[in-house]
Protein backbone atom coordinates (compact mmCIF):
# COMPACT_ATOMS: atom_id res chain seq x y z
CA UNK A 1 0.00 0.00 0.00
CA UNK A 2 2.86 2.39 0.61
CA UNK A 3 3.71 2.23 -3.10
CA UNK A 4 0.27 3.59 -3.99
CA UNK A 5 0.68 6.71 -1.86
CA UNK A 6 1.97 9.62 -3.90
CA UNK A 7 3.43 12.78 -2.43
CA UNK A 8 1.69 15.53 -4.44
CA UNK A 9 3.22 18.40 -2.49
CA UNK A 10 6.52 18.15 -4.39
CA UNK A 11 4.99 17.75 -7.85
CA UNK A 12 5.19 20.64 -10.28
CA UNK A 13 2.17 21.12 -12.48
CA UNK A 14 2.26 22.07 -16.13
CA UNK A 15 0.48 25.29 -15.28
CA UNK A 16 3.20 26.21 -12.78
CA UNK A 17 5.88 25.55 -15.39
CA UNK A 18 4.10 27.72 -17.97
CA UNK A 19 3.76 30.57 -15.48
CA UNK A 20 7.43 30.32 -14.57
CA UNK A 21 8.38 30.31 -18.26
CA UNK A 22 6.31 33.45 -18.85
CA UNK A 23 8.02 35.21 -15.94
CA UNK A 24 11.45 34.26 -17.30
CA UNK A 25 10.51 35.44 -20.80
CA UNK A 26 9.20 38.68 -19.34
CA UNK A 27 12.49 39.30 -17.59
CA UNK A 28 14.50 38.47 -20.71
CA UNK A 29 12.38 40.57 -23.06
CA UNK A 30 11.96 43.46 -20.67
CA UNK A 31 8.20 43.45 -21.11
CA UNK A 32 5.20 41.73 -19.63
CA UNK A 33 4.03 38.37 -20.88
CA UNK A 34 0.67 38.39 -22.68
CA UNK A 35 -2.26 38.55 -20.28
CA UNK A 36 -4.16 35.84 -22.16
CA UNK A 37 -1.30 33.37 -21.69
CA UNK A 38 -0.80 32.98 -25.45
CA UNK A 39 2.89 33.77 -25.81
CA UNK A 40 2.90 32.63 -29.45
CA UNK A 41 0.72 35.55 -30.49
CA UNK A 42 3.15 38.12 -29.13
CA UNK A 43 6.18 36.20 -30.34
CA UNK A 44 4.61 35.96 -33.79
CA UNK A 45 4.49 39.73 -34.00
CA UNK A 46 8.09 39.92 -32.87
CA UNK A 47 9.16 37.37 -35.48
CA UNK A 48 7.46 39.40 -38.20
CA UNK A 49 9.42 42.48 -37.11
CA UNK A 50 12.66 40.49 -37.23
CA UNK A 51 11.90 39.31 -40.76
CA UNK A 52 11.41 42.88 -41.93
CA UNK A 53 14.69 43.92 -40.30
CA UNK A 54 16.53 41.10 -42.09
CA UNK A 55 15.09 42.21 -45.43
CA UNK A 56 16.12 45.80 -44.77
CA UNK A 57 19.63 44.68 -43.84
CA UNK A 58 19.99 42.71 -47.07
CA UNK A 59 18.77 45.63 -49.18
CA UNK A 60 20.60 48.15 -47.02
CA UNK A 61 24.02 46.66 -47.77
CA UNK A 62 23.74 47.67 -51.42
CA UNK A 63 22.66 51.17 -50.48
CA UNK A 64 25.56 51.52 -48.06
CA UNK A 65 28.06 50.78 -50.82
CA UNK A 66 26.52 53.50 -52.99
CA UNK A 67 26.26 56.04 -50.18
CA UNK A 68 29.47 55.48 -48.23
CA UNK A 69 29.98 59.22 -47.78
CA UNK A 70 26.43 59.73 -46.48
CA UNK A 71 26.68 57.92 -43.15
CA UNK A 72 24.33 60.47 -41.59
CA UNK A 73 21.29 58.96 -43.27
CA UNK A 74 21.94 55.57 -41.67
CA UNK A 75 22.13 57.11 -38.24
CA UNK A 76 18.91 59.00 -38.92
CA UNK A 77 17.06 55.75 -39.58
CA UNK A 78 18.15 54.33 -36.26
CA UNK A 79 17.07 57.50 -34.47
CA UNK A 80 13.65 57.34 -36.13
CA UNK A 81 13.20 53.74 -35.00
CA UNK A 82 14.16 54.66 -31.46
CA UNK A 83 11.75 57.60 -31.48
CA UNK A 84 8.95 55.41 -32.81
CA UNK A 85 9.53 52.89 -30.04
CA UNK A 86 9.46 55.59 -27.37
CA UNK A 87 7.04 57.96 -29.08
CA UNK A 88 4.74 58.19 -26.09
CA UNK A 89 7.59 59.01 -23.74
CA UNK A 90 8.93 61.59 -26.17
CA UNK A 91 5.56 63.34 -26.19
CA UNK A 92 5.50 63.38 -22.41
CA UNK A 93 9.05 64.74 -22.33
CA UNK A 94 8.07 67.55 -24.72
CA UNK A 95 5.31 68.63 -22.37
CA UNK A 96 7.77 68.74 -19.49
CA UNK A 97 10.20 70.78 -21.59
CA UNK A 98 7.52 73.38 -22.30
CA UNK A 99 6.83 73.78 -18.61
CA UNK A 100 10.54 74.12 -17.83
CA UNK A 101 10.96 76.71 -20.58
CA UNK A 102 8.13 78.81 -19.20
CA UNK A 103 9.66 78.68 -15.74
CA UNK A 104 13.01 79.82 -17.10
CA UNK A 105 11.44 82.77 -18.89
CA UNK A 106 9.70 83.96 -15.74
CA UNK A 107 12.92 83.56 -13.75
CA UNK A 108 14.81 85.68 -16.28
CA UNK A 109 12.16 88.41 -16.16
CA UNK A 110 12.50 88.78 -12.38
From Swiss-Prot:
Keyword Disulfide bond set for record: no
S-S bridge residues: none
Modified residues (N-acetylmethionine): 1
Subunit structure: Interacts with NUPR1; regulates apoptotic process.
A GO term from the CC aspect: nucleus
Job description of the protein: Prothymosin alpha may mediate immune function by conferring resistance to certain opportunistic infections.
Location, primary (coarse class): nucleus
Subcellular location: Nucleus
Protein species of origin: Bos taurus
Residue numbers bearing the Phosphoserine modification: 2, 9-10
Any Pfam family: Prothymosin
GO MF, any single term: histone binding
UniProt family annotation: Belongs to the pro/parathymosin family.
GO biological process: negative regulation of apoptotic process; positive regulation of transcription by RNA polymerase II
Position(s), cross-link Glycyl lysine isopeptide (Lys-Gly) (interchain with G-Cter in SUMO2): 102
Residue numbers bearing the Phosphothreonine modification: 8, 13-14, 101, 106
Compositionally skewed regions (Basic and acidic residues) per UniProt: 13-31, 100-110
Low complexity: compositionally biased ranges: 32-41
Chain segments carrying region Disordered: 1-110
Family matches, as InterPro entries: Pro/parathymosin
Biased composition (Acidic residues): 42-83
Organism superkingdom: Eukaryota
Protein name as annotated: Prothymosin alpha
Post-translational modification comment from the UniProt entry: Covalently linked to a small RNA of about 20 nucleotides.
UniProt modified residues of type N6-succinyllysine: 15
Amino acid sequence: MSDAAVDTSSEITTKDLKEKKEVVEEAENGREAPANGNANEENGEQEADNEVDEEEEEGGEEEEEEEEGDGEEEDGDEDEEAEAATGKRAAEDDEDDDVDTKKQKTDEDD
